[in-house]
A protein has these predicted regions:
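N-terminal Sec-pathway targeting helices
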Residues: 2-14
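Hydrophobic membrane-insertion alpha-helices, especially the h-region
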Residues: 14-22
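C-terminal motif of bacterial Sec signal peptides marking the signal peptidase cleavage site
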Residues: 24-27
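N-terminal capping segments
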Residues: 33-125
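...with weaker cross-activation on analogous glycine-rich loops/strands in unrelated enzymes
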Residues: 125-199
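Low-complexity, Gly/Ser/Thr/Pro-rich intrinsically disordered linker/tail segments
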Residues: 202-238
């Protein structure tokens, strides 16, 4: 069987950048997906650095990042820096964690839109408790952010780039970290069990994609405790 040639020069650069970001210093199909391209008010690197801060230590909480009424940003999503309660709650759990046992315990972790909203707040704002924040329904994020002049809106994920925010029709939202040659995306998102790096299927619908392999390497290397509990790094974005 003929092996697929991988353009490592195109894939390893964003992965290298990602590894640098992880250490705190600074391209790897879905209908009805939309994205918002990052606007360079603050650099994409700033945005991705913030996106990685909760990774591997923040569990998925349905409603996490929202206020008590579930109408917008909660305290954590209006605060600069990580909430100490996220890591504390993570430390009390193990590989049997089930988010359904902690629904709406909003201070313990983040859901997908709470995570993206927190990341944007920590990138754009300079002080806590300023304004209304950026948490809203996942499927509405891309259009709303474009209307807020935070980026441009497209109704397709073709030509995705690192820093893009992608809203999915199934009420999920994620941040693109890198684009792989097989069409798969390396992403950061909050999805059960929590905030993690994952890889999407490739353009042919295969789950063993380049992005999935890179996600596993990154999580295993830089977040070993998380990976020992939650080794699944695959997300079906079709």
């Amino acid at each position: 069987m003929k092996k697929r040639k991988i353009r490592y020069d195109r894939i390893l650069l964003p992965i290298l950048i990602l590894c640098v970001i992880i250490f705190g210093i600074s391209s790897c199909h879905k209908t009805e997906e939309t994205k918002i391209q990052s606007k360079p008010i603050h650099t994409t690197t700033d945005f991705l650095k913030n996106a990685l801060k909760p990774v591997g230590q923040t569990l998925y909480i349905y409603g996490g990042g929202w206020n008590e009424a579930q109408t917008g940003s909660g305290t954590e999503a209006l605060t600069l820096g990580l909430s100490k309660e996220w890591k504390s709650f993570y430390d009390t759990q193990d590989n049997t964690y089930n988010y359904e046992n902690y629904m709406y315990e909003i201070h313990k972790g983040l859901d997908c839109s709470g995570y993206v909203g927190w990341t944007i707040y920590n990138t754009l704002e300079t002080k806590s408790k300023h304004g209304n924040g950026y948490v809203l329904k996942a499927e509405e994020m891309t259009k709303t952010f474009a209307n807020m002049k935070l980026g441009s809106y497209k109704d397709s994920i073709q030509n995705a780039k690192p820093g893009d925010i992608v809203s999915m029709a199934n009420a999920h939202v994620y941040i693109v970290l890198a684009v792989c040659e097989d069409g798969s995306l390396l992403i950061a998102h909050s999805s059960p069990p929590g905030v993690k790096i994952s890889g999407t299927y490739d353009q042919n619908g295969n789950s063993n994609s380049q992005a999935v392999l890179y996600a596993k390497k990154i999580m295993k290397t830089y977040y070993p405790d998380w990976y020992s509990r939650y080794p699944d790094c695959t997300v079906d974005s079709r």
